[in-house]
Amino acid sequence: MICTKLDECVKNELTNQHIASCTNSNAQCIEVSDRRSYVKCEERKKRYVLENTQKSHVILYKVDGGVVLQDKTVPQGMCRCDYLFVIHGEMAEAIFTELKGVDVAHSLKQIEGTLTQYKSFLSQFAHVYGRVIVSSSTPDIKASPAYVNLSRKLRNTYKGNLKIVKMQFTEKDTELSM
């Protein structure tokens, strides 16, 4: 099942209300929704940590298995990333995060697929970023068409960027665009 109420869910979370009829049972989707100093997602020793220096309200959504719950309504082979950070500060920002083993090329497809699926939802954000955390050394794929196209799309369409990092990455909210 693909959540069609993500926009409504974000607005309700920011006002401490609950969505009237969540099709995905949002307890499975939302991992964090508050102003904590550090918001992290991790799996199999790979970790992304957002340092919330501005104490903005941050909502951490589990995309794969939460916002997009695999069932017969989800197209077979549909690519989606692992997590979505929604930062509600001076400007609304979003970070799509993929925690990946070694197949970096596939992780780029997963972020691309999620961007495509939620294109209209993303129009409300000043910046949208892509983060890939890999378990092996970061391969030199910056010349690959998939990397170039996704990086260009994030930069030109969403005023964001793409970063690929090995194992663990801690990033300040004030340094996302660097």
Model-derived regions: residue spans:
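N-terminal, charge-rich interaction modules
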Residues: 1-64
